[in-house]
């Protein structure tokens, strides 16, 4: 048995822990990568520049989620064929997805660059930070194909049980990004433009290294394959499109929520942006566990090991509980110090209050997000996409309804009061669907 097949051979808790930990560390470094811009800009340029970078976050998340969702469709099928040891189909999926998504990423990058000003204006970005926000966004879109391809390749690595290579590349690119941020922002005084340019260069180098290493890895699996297969593309899109819709729609929802926050002023936006970065750090821990569950489930489904799927789900819930407790302790103890990392000396009392209140509220309820992500991960791994999409749309609807209806009338606090309610509703719907979708040996035999 190959050492690459530990997801279908080792004890479920051990297999998921070994597989998920590099992904969790990778998520941490991904956020370090993203937060470097905010922290360095906030410390060396000021809170207005921080707000400009933060104002772009919700929009850039939409495009990142398109990349992540696109990778899900390919990743589920790669995992399934890998578990079944059908390396010919696996490599055909890999090639087809890389060609298709490279074209898509270039088109999205051109679209984003051309319409940056229009999109930021639609978000009601405060006038005093609009120009800097648009500048940051345009540089971001120049490098978008690199970001897109890196995320697709990371999904490919994890689909075959390899999560350490993406971690190594992320550590390298994060360190490079921080040093270049310090050089361009603090030393050269390039401000928001320097922060965006540093990120673009680091992403580009990381994407090229990922591509070279992945092609080298694929040579281990000797088999004939087609460079492009329309039928496999269709199969992949059946899973990818719902995932893209789910991930991008949720990010669009967050973008709309930011439009609700923007009228409260630059300092409220700075506080909200600071906590959004912190939310992303902890959220991606739970997202990583859910993403680890998907290839685990898909590989075991391909290998016709149905009982291991249930055990893997329970193991994921244990990991989620441990990290939810850790998040609560860290936020309760250090929320003021964490806020100061982003807001610096220029942050007003309002900015610190918004950041601290939002952060502590999230700390109480991260467990809901954890169990939601684990359940969604099983559904994705099984290819059960419709209830997965419905559950996430309900989550979005609750979050938007409360923010849009209550926040303008009663205060900014209602922006984050809806978050755990949406997570919990999502979990309930996903869990009911999962109970109806547990695979049987008979189902696997016709896979």
Give residue ranges: language-model regions:
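Small-residue-rich hydrophobic transmembrane alpha-helices
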Residues: 50-110, 147-166, 271-335, 369-383, ...
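Helix-terminus/linker motif at the lipid-water interface of multi-pass membrane proteins
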Residues: 28, 32-50, 120-127, 183-190, ...
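N-terminal transmembrane alpha-helices
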Residues: 8-44, 58-73, 77, 102-109, ...
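Interfacial/gating helices of multi-pass transporter permease domains
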Residues: 18, 41-61, 127-132, 192-193, ...
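Short alpha-helical transmembrane segments in multi-pass integral membrane proteins
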Residues: 1-20, 78-143, 187-241, 297-364, ...
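Transmembrane helical elements of multi-pass membrane transporters/channels
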Residues: 18-37, 139, 173, 202-206, ...
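Short runs within selected transmembrane alpha-helices of multi-pass transporters and secretion channels
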Residues: 71, 140-158, 166-174, 195-208, ...
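Hydrophobic transmembrane alpha-helices of multi-pass small-molecule transporters
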Residues: 62-65, 177-181, 206-211, 281-284, ...
